[in-house]
């Protein structure tokens, strides 16, 4: 299949916008906007995240480490844009969107899933991260930021 056909087809797969965040052993903070996040199992509660090998967060997502999947609300496009830009990783945390006291997470997100990495699988240009959800918190109403066809949905 030609690469271009696959890219066009995937543009029609609407999804919620998530930001993955973590802190490494040295205390460095990392985040990235993720387009490939999905639930894996309910028992145990687990998720799957795909991370490009060139992403700065890549090496911090290792077995046993903690991460947070922050599912964004409609009014959090700025956070999504910041975490998907080429800006230095440290600049992504120079605002009041975050609580960085433990596992960094976005305050006022639609949902936060606090996870521990259980397994990683290398697959061509990406790492598949399988993580067990240890706790979560969610807003009371549905107001999720959605993305499809190269842009945010209203």
Name every feature range the model reports, one short phrase each.
Residues 1-154:
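Basic, polyanion-binding surface patches
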């Amino acid at each position: 299949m030609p690469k271009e056909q696959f890219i066009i087809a995937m543009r029609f797969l609407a999804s919620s916008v998530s930001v993955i965040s973590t802190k490494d052993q040295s205390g460095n903070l990392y985040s990235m906007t993720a387009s490939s996040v999905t639930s894996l199992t309910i028992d145990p509660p687990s998720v799957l995240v795909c991370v490009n090998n060139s992403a700065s967060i890549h090496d911090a997502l290792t077995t046993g480490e903690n991460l947070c999947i922050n599912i964004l609300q409609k009014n959090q496009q700025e956070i999504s844009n910041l975490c998907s830009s080429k800006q230095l990783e440290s600049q992504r945390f120079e605002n009041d969107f975050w609580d960085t006291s433990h596992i960094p997470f976005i305050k006022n997100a639609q949902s936060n899933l606090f996870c521990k990495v259980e397994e990683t699988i290398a697959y061509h240009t990406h790492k598949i991260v399988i993580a067990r959800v240890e706790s979560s918190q969610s807003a009371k109403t549905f107001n999720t930021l959605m993305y499809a066809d190269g842009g945010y949905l209203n």
